Amino acid sequence: MLYNLLVSHINSCYIFSIFYNVIVRSGIAILLSFSISFSLIPILIKYFKYWKNLAQPIRNLGHKSHIAKAGTPTMGGIAIIFSIIISTLMLADYKNIYVLTTIFGMLSLAILGLIDDYQKVTKKNTKGINATCKLISQIMVSIICCMIVNYNLNSEIANHLIIPFFKKLTIDLSIFYIPFALFIIIGSSNAVNLTDGLDGLVTVPIIIVSFCLGLMCYLADNAQYININHLQILHVQQASELTVLCSAIIGASLGFLWYNIQPAKIFMGDVGSLSLGGAIGIISVISKNEIRLGIIGGLFVIEALSAIIQIYSIRYLGGKRVFKMAPIHHHFEQIGWSESKIVSRFWLLSIIFSLIGLSSLIL
């Protein structure tokens, strides 16, 4: 809104022209979303501590160190999502269909996560919403987002899929693209949700992935100014406005991380993890970086696969467990790794995956 207002008055004040620059607005978005998130979270902590029945329930089967976390407030994702939306609407072009679609998807999944969190804390169990109802809701939101994106993308690339590390190789999935895009968005949402199990664990990877996606959105939109022949990327007009949104995610997550580093004063909750995971999934679909998301977000993939493998192993191999506990970060807890050691190692893995993903732009 602020961006649109200032641009409309560019003739009366030349200095407003700097707001044409996506990089300038992205930098401001980081600072603004950080400030809002950093300021709002202490208020949430105070409020949720006052209402003690809104504390995070702890699984009885979890590591014994988690018992000390009983009573820690949850639903900190409220502050993150609020900060992102306010910053994005102020500094991005709010008429941009890709921005609006991502905000719609993120907000819808945040509401779903909020309902899930509320059921968990009020009923004092870790199950929340029925899994089938949650999945159906995610599918409905994802279908709407995919249809909007597919309709607005250039028809020459709408159903195309980039294969990283294979120069100029794209595959036209045709009618199978929408189901594939649904898998990316829903999978991303749930994978991030599964990763959110230790203090600070999911926040830094979200920041790293958002940075990579923001960069790729900028490159995708500015292909005419870059020697696109040397980059494995498709030209997506108006995608650079999503760089502002990605920057807002970075800033809001940094503000949250201040209070979420061990020992955490507040947890993100499903309201944050489901929506942020969904947002990066939607952005990857818009910018045509679906497979590349699986690389830069490799940590999320590993966490999700470990949970899937464990479930199928128990169900079809006579109760045999591949891991001591899933997702995999809990496995490392069970074999004696400290929480800080697991988190720091997983952060390093996330950095490595992001570097591999970015290298696929030029290799």
Swiss-Prot record:
This protein's pathway: Cell wall biogenesis; peptidoglycan biosynthesis
Reactions this protein catalyses: UDP-N-acetyl-alpha-D-muramoyl-L-alanyl-gamma-D-glutamyl-meso-2,6-diaminopimeloyl-D-alanyl-D-alanine + di-trans,octa-cis-undecaprenyl phosphate = di-trans,octa-cis-undecaprenyl diphospho-N-acetyl-alpha-D-muramoyl-L-alanyl-D-glutamyl-meso-2,6-diaminopimeloyl-D-alanyl-D-alanine + UMP
Keywords: Cell cycle, Cell division, Cell inner membrane, Cell membrane, Cell shape, Cell wall biogenesis/degradation, Magnesium, Membrane, Metal-binding, Peptidoglycan synthesis, Transferase, Transmembrane, Transmembrane helix
Pfam families: Glycos_transf_4, MraY_sig1
Top-level taxon of origin: Bacteria
Example GO molecular function: phospho-N-acetylmuramoyl-pentapeptide-transferase activity
An annotated GO BP: peptidoglycan biosynthetic process
Obligatory cofactor(s): Mg(2+)
Intracellular or extracellular location(s): Cell inner membrane
UniProt function note: Catalyzes the initial step of the lipid cycle reactions in the biosynthesis of the cell wall peptidoglycan: transfers peptidoglycan precursor phospho-MurNAc-pentapeptide from UDP-MurNAc-pentapeptide onto the lipid carrier undecaprenyl phosphate, yielding undecaprenyl-pyrophosphoryl-MurNAc-pentapeptide, known as lipid I.
Name under which the protein is recorded: Phospho-N-acetylmuramoyl-pentapeptide-transferase
Organism whose genome encodes this protein: Orientia tsutsugamushi (strain Ikeda) (Rickettsia tsutsugamushi)
Lineage: Bacteria, Pseudomonadati, Pseudomonadota, Alphaproteobacteria, Rickettsiales
Gene: mraY
